[in-house]
Amino acid sequence: MFEFSRSSSAEAERPEPFSQEGPALWSASLRSWDLCFEMDEQDRVIRVGGRQAYRLQCAHGLGEQPRPFAEYLERRAPGAPTLAGLRRGERLDLTLRSDAAAPLTCRFQPMQPLDGLGRSLLLGMDISDLNWQSDSQQHQLQSLSLGKLILSRLRHVSHGHLAEAVQEILESLSGAFQMQAIALLLGDGKGFCTVFASHVRPGSDSLLRPPLQLADDDLREGAGARLLRRGEGASTLLRQIGEDALYLVPATMRGGRLGALLVRPMSLEQLAQGPAPQDWQYLAELLANQVADRCELHEQHDSSRKLGLLQEMIGGGWWRYWAEQELFELAPALHDSLGLTGEYRRVPLEHLQGLLQPADADELGLRLRASLRSGQALAQDLCLRQPDSRGERRWLRIEGRPLGRGSALGLSGVLLDISEGRRQEERAQAAHARLRSLIDSAPVVIYVQRVEQGHLVPEFYSESASNLLGLDLQGQSWQALAERVHPDDLEAFFARGRELLREGRVKTRYRLADGQGNWHWLYDEAKLLRDAQGLPSEAVGLWLDVTEQHLAAQRIAESEERYRVLVEDSPALICRYTADLVLTYVNRTFADSLATSPERLVGRRLDEWLAAEDASALRARLLGSPREGASEVPELRFNLPGQRFLWLVWAERPLFDARGELCEVQAVGRDNTPVRRAQQQLAQGAKMASLGEMVSGLAHEVKQPLHVLRMTLFNMRQRMNSVGLDGDYLGEKLERMDAQVLRVDRLVSHLGVFSRKSALEALPFDPYAAFEGALGLLGEGLRQHAIEVECPAPTQRMVVRGQADQLEQVIINLLANARDALLGNPGLASRRVRLEQVACREPGWVELHVHDNGGGIEPLLLERIFEPFFTTKAEGKGTGLGLSVSHDLVRNMGGSLTAANQGEGALFVVRLPLAAPAEAGG
C-alpha cells in the first residue's frame, strides 16, 4: 500500500514498503522533508511519506499496486524542466493534488538512488505559501480590477441596456480567465433562478443563455464555489444543462435571494490557473448584487411612477395621520387634488375638516379617535364643501389602519375619489325607485319564481297583483296559486311549468280567481334565467289581464255577420287586392261605381282603371308598406267608360302573413268626385275673375298695337297722296304692321289658352314659363302703375310635372296681390316686385319666389291667408279665393305654397318636386 507520513505515530501505523533497502536514509528523510516519494525506475510511486503527506489526495480503489507519479500532480510549474531532469540532477517546483482548498506546491531535489535495484528517493520542501501568495495576490488584483470594471460599467447604464452591459462584463471575465461560457443567474424569490445575461464564445454550444430557468435547490448542491463533474457523483444541474463539467459560484444577495455564476471552463487546467474560490465568490456576489439593486431600483421607480399615475387618475392617494400632533401627511397627487397649498404636504386635522361638510367633519374626528382607541380599521365616506368644476358634489372614501404606538401612534391608509361611483349609485337608486314605481303601477303583474330542484317557487309579485286580483300573493306557495286556477285550465297551467323548464320560455293563457271569486283571463309570459354555470336559477314573467279581450272576441264573433252586411252595404268603396293589384274582394258599392258586378271584378287588375302614374305610385307604396297601420293616398283617379272620371280618397292597409310577407291589401275609397269638380269650377271661376281684373291692362295691351297700325296706315296714305309708294317704303310699313298683328295674336291666343279649363293629365313643363306667361298678361299693367318688375333668367332650366296653366294662374294671383299691396301703400318711394327661380338645397325640388316691398303681412294674419274667403282687402275689393285656390293648385301638383315677411315686404314661395330624369330629358 501507499504510505502517508504525518508524525511518528502515523509512521508506526504505516504498512511495510516493498523494499527494505536503505532504511536509514528513508527514516531520516521522513523527519527532515515535507514530502518523500520512493520511486521505481518507471517513475511509479512505491511509498509516500513526510510531514505534509497527509495533505495529498488519495485515489479510491488503487489497491497496493504502484501508482504513476503523474497522477499525484495538479499542475506543473511554468517553465520547469521535465521529470527526467530530476534524474539528471535538476530541481523542480511541482504542484500536487491536495485534499484542501489550497494547492500543495513543493520544490523537489534531484533524485537520489536508494538501492541497486533502480529505486530512487524524491524529496521535496513545501513552498505553497510562497507560490500561493504570489498567485493569490495576482488573482486578487485581477478580481479587484474586474470589480472596478463592474462598478463603473453598471453605474450609469440605463435599465434598458443593463442586460447588454452585464453581457459585456461576462465577456470580459470569459476573456480574462479563458472560459467557454459564463452566465449570471438571479433568483426570483419563488424558488427559481433565471439566466439574466450570458456570454458564449463563438463556435461553442451551450444552454447557458436567457431565458434558462433553474431551481434554487439545484444551485445549493454544496456550499461555496465548487467544480461539478459527472465523474464525481450525480448532479441534477449538469443533467439539466447537458454539460460534463461546470464551475458553480453561488452568490447570496441582499434580502436572502440566491444568485449564481455558472462557468464552463475551456479546460480544468485553465480553471485551476484562474482566481481562487473566494475571488470568484467576490466577483459573483458583487455582480449579482449590483444587477439586483439596479433591477430593484428600476422596479421601485416604475412602481412609484405607476402609483403616482394611478393616484392622479383616481383623484386620491395615501395618507398618514399622527395622533399626537393631529397632523395629516398626504400624497402629492391627493394634496393637489384637494386644492391644498404647502411645501411639505402636511395638513392639520382642523384644516382638513374645514374642507368637509360639517356632519362629515365631526364624524371623521370621532372615527379617528375611536380607531386609535380600539385598534380597528377606519372607513368613512366624506363629502367636500366645494363642488367640482361641473358644479357637482365631490365624494371621497377614506380607509385606514392603526400603526405605531406611544408617541408614534397614528393611522395610515388611502383616500379615494368616489364621486362618480356615488353619482352612479344615486342615479341607480333613482332609477330603481322609478322602476319599482313603474312596476307597481303597471297594468301588468311582474313576478319572479325561484328554481329549486326542478320546482318553481314563488318569490316576488309586484304590488299591481293586489290591484288586479285583490290578493296578497307575497309568501304564498305554488300549491296555493294552483288552487286558484280554473279547473278547465289546470292542464295548461301544469304544462306551463314543464315547458318553461324545458324550453326556457313560455306563453300561455288560463283563468285565475280573484279575492271575490271572479275569474280573470291571464296572459302569462315568462323567461327562464340561468346562472354562470348555465343552470336554471329563476324565472321572470308577467301576467296581463286579457279578460276584456276574451269578451271582446266573443262579441266580435257574435257580430261578425252584422259587420259583413255593413261592409257590403256600406256607402264607402271597399276592396282587397294582392301585391300585383289583382282584386280578391269588392263590395257592392265599389262594383256599382264601376258599373259591373262584384263577381266580374274579382280577378281583374286594379290598374285597368288607373293612369300609369297612379299605378306606379301605388306599386311603389306597396313595396315600402309599413308593418302596421294604414296609409292614406290623397286621391286616385279612375278612368271610366264614356270619358268619365271617378276621384277617390284612397286609404289602404297592408296585410302580412306569418312570415312577414305582404299577402293582401285592404283599401277603402271615398268618392271625392263632386268635391273635385267643385274645385275645378272654383279654379276656373278664379281664373276668369283674374281675367276680369286684368281687362284694363289687357285693353291697353291690345289698344297699343292697334294705335301703331292706325298711325302706319295714316302715314302710308299721306305718302301715297304726295309722292307715291315705292317698294322699300311699302315693305317696311307692311313688316311693321305684321309685327303688331302678331303681337295682338299672341296675346289673344294666350288669353284663350289661359281661359280654357285645365287638362286633367299632369304633364312635364318648365316652371319658369309661368313667370313669362304671367308677365305677358300683367306686365304692361304693372308698368302703368310704375311698379318695377325684376325677373332674372335662371342659371339652369328645370322641369316639373303638373298643369302649366294652373301654375301660371298661381303666379298671376301672387302678382295681383303684390300689385294691390304696393298700390295700397302710397308712402313708398319705389315699388318693386322680384320673380326668381331658386334651386333648393334639398335635391329633387325647385322653388319659385315672388317678393315685393309693399310692407308685408300682419304676423297674426299669416296663418289665415290661405283660408277660403279670407281677404285683407277692403269690402268689395276681393273674393278671398285667390290664395286659397292657389294653395290647392300647388298642393295637387305635390308641392307647397308658403308665405312669410322678409325685408320690406312679403315673400311667397312655391315649392315643387322636379320631374323624373326620363321626363325631363324627353
From Swiss-Prot:
Chain intervals with Low complexity compositional bias: 1-10
A molecular function (GO) term: ATP binding
Induction: By carbon starvation. This increased expression is controlled by RpoS.
Gene3D superfamilies membership: 1.10.287.130, Histidine kinase-like ATPase, C-terminal domain, PAS domain
Post-translational modification: Autophosphorylated.
EC class name: transferase
Matches recorded under InterPro entries: HATPase_C_sf (IPR036890), His_kinase_dom (IPR005467), HisK_dim/P_dom (IPR003661), HisK_dim/P_sf (IPR036097), PAC (IPR001610), PAS (IPR000014), PAS-assoc_C (IPR000700), PAS-like_dom_sf (IPR035965)
Residue intervals of the PAC domain: 506-558, 632-684
Catalytic activity: ATP + protein L-histidine = ADP + protein N-phospho-L-histidine
Pfam assignment, any one: HATPase_c
PAS domain ranges (all copies): 559-622
Enzyme Commission number(s) from the entry: 2.7.13.3
Identification of the protein by name: Two-component sensor PprA
